[in-house]
Structures are given as structure tokens and as C-alpha cells.
Amino acid sequence: MDTKVKAYICSPLSAETDQEIQQNMVYARRCVAEVAKEFGYRAYAPHAYLPELLDDHDPEERALALSFGISVLEHCHLLIICGSRISSGMEIEIKKAFQDQMAVFRYYPDNKQTLIPVKDWRQLDEMQIPVKDISE
């Protein structure tokens, strides 16, 4: 039986172009690897791979992908928000984590070995960086 802490990686996926979606998938995979290495957690990011099977621009397929992600989230111990921006899909995942009284943290890949606890949903608005200032 696996006794490692299971961490759900929450990072942006949706983007206007397929190239941007691919970049976001690579970013999610990087976060999975870093969280596993830095904290020893078993990290999950379904959105790092699902766009290879499902079209994020198709509403039905996007809903299916979000549903799958929520199912994976329900099997995790905590949620880690990666990056500086909260997308609409991330918002759904984060609200579910708070609803289930799951521990929620922020992680910035440039600030390794640090998880910042998020105790309240309102903190996320304070941490949000305007879209025009984002380079991820």
C-alpha cells in the first residue's frame, strides 16, 4: 500500500492556442516533478496529460476532463496551487478542496522547498497577479 502523501497539482491549462495549452501541460509536468522531488509527495496533475485525449476547446470534452480531475482530487490529501494565476478550471478544483476541508497550499517553482498555506478562499484574490503581468 502506498503511504506517501498524495498531492493534487492545480495549475492553469486553458489557453487560446494549442501551443499555449502545450506550454501549460509542460508547466504542470514540471510542477509534478518538483513537488515530488522537493517534498516527497506523490503528485497528480491530470491536466498535464488529458489534452492529449480530450479537446479543451470542446465544452463536452472539457467538462469530462474537469470531472476526471475532480475524481483524482478526491483521492488526494492536499491541493497545491502552482503559479501566479487562477484559471476558471483551477477555481473549481480549489473550491472543491476547501469544501472537502483539504489542506491547500501555494507553490512557486522559483521558491523551492516552500509551501505557503492558504487558509481562506479570499487569500487567493490577494495573491492573484493580473493576467497582463503573467509570463507562465
Predicted regions and their residues:
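Conserved catalytic or regulatory cores that recognize and/or transform ribose-phosphate-containing ligands
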Residues: 1-136
